[in-house]
Amino acid sequence: MSSKVIIFDTTLRDGEQALQASLSVKEKLQIALSLEKCGIDIIEVGFPISSPGDFKSVQTISKKIKNSRICSLARCVEKDIEVAGDAMSSSDFFRIHIFLATSTLHMESKLRKNFDEIIDMAVSSVKKALRYTDDVEFSCEDASRTTMDNLCRIVEKLIKAGVKTINIPDTVGYTIPNELSNIIKNLFERVPNIHKSIISVHCHNDLGMAVGNSISAIQAGARQIEGTINGIGERAGNTALEEIIMAIKVREDILGVSTNIVHKEIYRTSQIISQICNMPIPANKAIVGSNAFAHSSGIHQDGVLKNRKNYEIMEPNTIGVKEVKLNLTSRSGRAAVKYYMDKMGYKDDDYDIDELYSAFLKLADKKGQVFDYDLEALAIFSKKQENAEYFYLKFFSVQSISNGLSTASVKLKCGKKVYTESSTTSNGPVDATYQALNKIINFPITLQKFQLVAKGKGKDALGQVDILVKYENRQFHGIGLATDIIESSAQAMINVLNNIWKSQQVNKKLKNLKKY
């Protein structure tokens, strides 16, 4: 049995079914190219019979992808198979993926056919697909609820007909790991020609067991895993491929298998798909979540700084994440504070760690999360100065008209002086407000992230805006909170401007100290 596990990605087919709006041809191509770069073996790019748009997407992607095998879905219908073959005809090598339900429930209530009819339909469709390609996969839909006798019977017939890959889907996410493992083991024990085909599994996550089921299937002999990046898909989603891939890599000692994946491309691919599909990745998502390599507990931070292996089972750069993330909160210890001071270039005798840590805890209790520039200010300035705000928004007004233009007027207090400015833009009221503010302060900043989160429900709910900007090769954060989205956006930018100003004052004081 091969020690290589084939990774079959269905983000563009099964994953897209979870989206509120279909992806454009250009967006699908961008995702497909990212998957190819990541080393995905099989990319299921669509269901071409479903719509002219899907046909065009499959056709376009087939012309561009060279290093991954293209695959399209088809029912056991001659026209489906013909259209799938035509859509991929420009590809040098492709797969047709046929499916048909095999469980008693589906046969009786959905298809209204007996099992002999199901076998005849399946075998006949495989023979038609083989006219277009020698790579045919067959999925026994709802296989996990199909009787073992029927499943063994149809699998044997399909392999005899020429199917190279037999897929065993847990279509409704009903199975638990030992059950799926037993199904795979039974197929190997009872189907005499089973070794002429690769056994695949396609698990859904309705009970949160998609990854666990897939791992158990590998241990039982399955050598293809189907899923999606970030686990997107109908209902509770599909097997998260990045989790399967890294489980195989990290626990190769137990599983004894490997993949063809370029691991350093995992994080980038995950981010691209999240952005294109407009599906944010939960912070606590395994492997690719923002907290996957973040540490907030003082004990954990100290342990990671001494040796990453204390609290990390894989190195962040393995999947393309640049560095470990230590969140500075009231739970952080001295080790994390010292780590950031060292990172900024300060030496131990530049500050008193006990005084700094005491001031840090008070600020962390107040702010929640502290950033490196906050620490720097605490180390240089007094507690009184730490709370000083140089910029204060005294007034703002926004007007948007039907031609798409927005005009913002702001009155900004800068120290003891007050300035008024206005700006008109076609990019919306938030951009107009930011441009008006920048006319006053004239900081060459670049907005890198803008995130709006509703705090509560209804018309009186608060909107929290979190922004991240780049100024002179350094990142600064800002948070604004108000019932009015424009106001919370403006306050977030004011927060950023004060953080930048505070950093500038630190630099000035450091320059003065160097003179003596």
Swiss-Prot record:
Pathway: Amino-acid biosynthesis; L-leucine biosynthesis; L-leucine from 3-methyl-2-oxobutanoate: step 1/4. Its cofactor is Mn(2+). It comes from the Bacteria. Residues 5-267 form the Pyruvate carboxyltransferase domain. It holds the Pfam family HCS_D2. GO terms for cellular component: cytosol. It catalyses: 3-methyl-2-oxobutanoate + acetyl-CoA + H2O = (2S)-2-isopropylmalate + CoA + H(+). The keyword Methyltransferase does not apply. Mn(2+) binds at residues 14, 202, 204, 238. One of its GO terms (biological process) is L-leucine biosynthetic process. It is found in: Cytoplasm. GO terms for molecular function: 2-isopropylmalate synthase activity; acetyl-CoA C-acetyltransferase activity; manganese ion binding. Its EC number is 2.3.3.13. Residues 392-516 are annotated as: Regulatory domain. The keyword tRNA-binding does not apply. Keywords: Amino-acid biosynthesis, Branched-chain amino acid biosynthesis, Cytoplasm, Leucine biosynthesis, Manganese, Metal-binding, Plasmid, Transferase. Catalyzes the condensation of the acetyl group of acetyl-CoA with 3-methyl-2-oxobutanoate (2-ketoisovalerate) to form 3-carboxy-3-hydroxy-4-methylpentanoate (2-isopropylmalate). Homodimer. PANTHER family: 2-ISOPROPYLMALATE SYNTHASE 1, CHLOROPLASTIC-RELATED, HOMOCITRATE SYNTHASE-RELATED. This is 2-isopropylmalate synthase. The lineage of its organism: Bacteria, Pseudomonadati, Pseudomonadota, Gammaproteobacteria, Enterobacterales. The gene is leuA.
